[in-house]
């Protein structure tokens, strides 16, 4: 089979773009690390918890939306009953199973 030269060119351009982006991020991280020795670093450090809180809140909203969608899908396509609860295994919803007494 002959290789597609234009496909390889696209892959190479994509790789170059990814590498350039990674180098830029690395450069910014290095600058942030070097700025911790300067008095202005406290401003940058003070912002990071706010960004983390914002990301955590956004992630929680995304998970809540996923849980709601999974719960609605399960109720629509199953005769069982499900609840939303955090799971050690990353499940968004858990089935509720009734306990039957032994006869």
UniProtKB/Swiss-Prot annotation:
Self-association and partners: Belongs to the multiprotein complex Integrator. Component of the SOSS complex, composed of SOSS-B (SOSS-B1/NABP2 or SOSS-B2/NABP1), SOSS-A/INTS3 and SOSS-C/INIP.
Pfam entry (one): SOSSC
Predominant location: nucleus
This protein's name: SOSS complex subunit C
Name of the gene: INIP
Annotated compartments: Nucleus
Protein role: Component of the SOSS complex, a multiprotein complex that functions downstream of the MRN complex to promote DNA repair and G2/M checkpoint. The SOSS complex associates with single-stranded DNA at DNA lesions and influences diverse endpoints in the cellular DNA damage response including cell-cycle checkpoint activation, recombinational repair and maintenance of genomic stability. Required for efficient homologous recombination-dependent repair of double-strand breaks (DSBs).
GO BP terms: DNA damage response; DNA repair; response to ionizing radiation
Organism, scientific name: Gallus gallus
PANTHER family: SOSS COMPLEX SUBUNIT C
Keyword DNA damage: yes
Domain of life: Eukaryota
GO CC field: nucleoplasm; nucleus; SOSS complex
Family indicated by similarity: Belongs to the SOSS-C family.
Keywords: DNA damage, DNA repair, Nucleus
């Amino acid at each position: 089979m002959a290789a597609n030269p234009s496909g390889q060119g696209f892959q190479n351009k994509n790789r170059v773009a990814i590498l350039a982006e990674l180098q830029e991020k690395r450069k910014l991280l290095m600058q942030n690390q070097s700025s911790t020795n300067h008095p202005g670093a406290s401003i940058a450090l003070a912002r990071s918890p706010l960004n983390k809180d914002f990301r955590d809140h956004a992630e929680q909203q995304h998970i809540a939306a996923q849980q709601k969608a999974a719960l609605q899908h399960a109720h629509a396509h199953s005769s069982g009953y499900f609840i939303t609860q955090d799971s050690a295994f990353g499940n968004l919803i858990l089935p509720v199973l009734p306990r039957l007494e032994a006869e």
